[in-house]
């Protein structure tokens, strides 16, 4: 799919009823990619000890230092706000997750040469579905609770460890296990710097090992419906000056259009806060 021809309906069809993922070519400029990569390299060069996910085997093998995360990207450069607010992606997310969808996280993942892959998994808020009894009875993917956007800053190839996924597994809504033959069935999300890979996080996937001599880095954006608790506390992390100057779209992404939870007892004036008729919100 080309950036200039993106239709929200096409993205939603691919995520819900298609393979679960779609590549949009040429979404971001070379200058945006270069600036994002510069910041990611700067903040990850000497910081191997950051929290990461789905790297239990790498931790056991003492190889976590070959995979590095950079969190709180909104506070590290305007280019990351530009990526999060990209109009074609925002339009698709409004249709997929609802008009008031939010951003749950924006981070970078850098896998160094010979860096490890991940265990096959599904993404937040489904990511601990290996404990299914912690979820409501009857939960299913007839409506989505997550969308992921991966923006490569380096080439995503089989050699560099492009994300692997098993098409159509978003309908399973379960954590992949050893008997699922993930690596025998998987395809790759190959892409070029500046592309955007949009996928439903319930689709089985994982980063693959980097067998090349170059880094493989990407910006990872998580979008959620307005009522799902975000993974990163972005509102607190970015600071008051950022919030004050935020665009209407960014305020929405930070969850400021949806005021809950709040201390309802502290509201001293009699108010009809919710409802179809004459509500304050």
Regions found by a protein language model. Give the residues of each.
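A structural signal for short, well-ordered beta-strand segments
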Residues: 106-108, 149-151, 219-223
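A short, structural micro-pattern
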Residues: 102, 143-145, 213-215
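Conserved double-stranded beta-helix
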Residues: 170-204, 208-281
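Short, solvent-exposed loop/turn segments at secondary-structure junctions
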Residues: 28-30, 108-113, 125, 156-158, ...
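Non-heme Fe(II)-dependent double-stranded beta-helix
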Residues: 1-19, 24-132, 138
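Short, surface-exposed beta-edge/turn micro-motifs
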Residues: 19, 146-148, 216
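Catalytic core of non-heme Fe(II) oxygenases with the double-stranded beta-helix
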Residues: 91, 116-191, 228-237
